[in-house]
Amino acid sequence: MIQHESRLKVADNSGARELLVIKILGGSKRKTGNIGDIVVAAVKQATPGGVVKKGDVVKAVIVRTKSGARREDGSYIKFDENAAVVINADKSPRGTRIFGPVARELREHDFMKIVSLAPEVL
């Protein structure tokens, strides 16, 4: 569960390293987000020479959460960290590489480009 003010690691090479969640999109009083949800976030740490700079406000999709997500068969998928991928307005990633595994739930939310770039889909 990701909420307002949560810090997320960035799982791509867009230049951002850490994000601070400003808003979870999808409803006026939405409190929490899970895997596959889009958030508006501020870049808190960035690598020099990247596409995204520190202080930029970006949209990102959550790809890993510590709290995990429940699957149809009753199992849960959990990760060691909370991570997101910076995206454009057309839901395509701003970076060209994805680091670490991503959840299969992204396929249901039409993030096929992220799923195809990821080294492992769990």
From Swiss-Prot:
SUPFAM superfamilies: Ribosomal protein L14. Keywords: Ribonucleoprotein, Ribosomal protein, RNA-binding, rRNA-binding. It holds the Pfam family Ribosomal_L14. One of its GO terms (biological process) is translation. One of its GO terms (cellular component) is cytosolic large ribosomal subunit. PROSITE patterns: RIBOSOMAL_L14 (PS00049). SMART domains: Ribosomal_L14. GO terms for molecular function: large ribosomal subunit rRNA binding; structural constituent of ribosome. It comes from the Bacteria. InterPro entries: Ribosomal_uL14, Ribosomal_uL14_bac-type, Ribosomal_uL14_CS, Ribosomal_uL14_sf. HAMAP family: Ribosomal_uL14. Binds to 23S rRNA. Forms part of two intersubunit bridges in the 70S ribosome. Part of the 50S ribosomal subunit. Forms a cluster with proteins L3 and L19. In the 70S ribosome, L14 and L19 interact and together make contacts with the 16S rRNA in bridges B5 and B8. Belongs to the universal ribosomal protein uL14 family. PANTHER family: 50S/60S RIBOSOMAL PROTEIN L14/L23 (PTHR11761), LARGE RIBOSOMAL SUBUNIT PROTEIN UL14M (PTHR11761:SF3). This is Large ribosomal subunit protein uL14. It comes from Lactobacillus gasseri (strain ATCC 33323 / DSM 20243 / BCRC 14619 / CIP 102991 / JCM 1131 / KCTC 3163 / NCIMB 11718 / NCTC 13722 / AM63).
